């Protein structure tokens, strides 16, 4: 079983994904840079977790599992 992500990470990732749907791709490194540009988060760990969750959301959308 995997770990459950914190609410802050999920909420921030969803907000970014909803506001800027065309900015993100399935590439984690690209998403990491975009999260850094679009937010004021200074923690590298938080940035990476948010970028990872955004990458997951992009993949799920492409597979048609989320609207």
UniProtKB/Swiss-Prot annotation:
One of its GO terms (biological process) is translation. The keyword Lyase does not apply. GO terms for molecular function: structural constituent of ribosome. The keyword RNA-binding does not apply. It comes from the Archaea. InterPro entries: Ribosomal_eS17, Ribosomal_eS17_CS, Ribosomal_eS17_sf. GO terms for cellular component: cytosol; ribonucleoprotein complex; ribosome. Keywords: Ribonucleoprotein, Ribosomal protein. Pfam families: Ribosomal_S17e. NCBIfam families: PRK01151.1 (NF002242). Belongs to the eukaryotic ribosomal protein eS17 family. PANTHER family: 40S RIBOSOMAL PROTEIN S17 (PTHR10732:SF0). This is Small ribosomal subunit protein eS17. It comes from Thermococcus sibiricus (strain DSM 12597 / MM 739).
């Amino acid at each position: 079983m995997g770990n459950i992500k914190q609410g802050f990470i999920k909420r921030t990732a969803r907000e970014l994904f909803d506001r800027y749907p065309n900015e993100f791709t399935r590439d984690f490194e690209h998403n990491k840079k975009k999260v850094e540009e679009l937010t004021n988060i200074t923690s590298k760990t938080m940035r990476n977790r948010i970028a990872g969750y955004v990458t997951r959301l992009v993949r799920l959308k492409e597979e048609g599992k989320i609207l």
